Amino acid sequence: MNLNKWLLGIGICSLGFGLYMVFVKPHVDDYYLDHENAQAIENYQSKNVSAIPLDTPTDKSKMIGYIEIKDAHIKAPVYPGAATEKQLKHGLSLVEEDESVDEQNVSIAGHKAEGRHLQFADLYKVHMGSKVEFHTKGETRRYEIVSHRKVNPTNTSVLEEKVGKSQLTLITCDDYNPNKNKWMTRSIYVAKAV
């Protein structure tokens, strides 16, 4: 009899823990991530402009700015590249190791997670003409979304410099295939300086 009660107690605890992990924990994680991002952005904004580094920091944990896209409800810190799995845990990241915010084509990568409010998860909500603000180096750079396309994950042509106006290239994973447990394409959003 005691064994049955003990097993029932373990079963109920296991079920409760499983339900918490599936239904509650992602929301708690999102809450804390949003709070950390908001605090990082507030700290960045409160810095004296002269205290904001003009060069891309070599310390990968130091923000280089933050991006704001109102149509997609995105306001997230941006960190130096390269956009490795480890670096993307901090937040959005410049794609390449030696990339600078002063390049003609600044490429920024972010995670997309189904059912979670994380980095570029809501980027799909933008449309042609959506406004993008990149706050960096004590200034606000304004852009407008001009194109969206999907590419093969091995396509690096989206990172190339092009003659003309400055642009942001926003990159996130797309078309998740649960059978292969991988993202099949990359969504590329290009925003031109206005």
Task: List the model feature ranges, each with a label.
Residues M1-K5:
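Positively charged n-region of N-terminal signal peptides that target proteins for export
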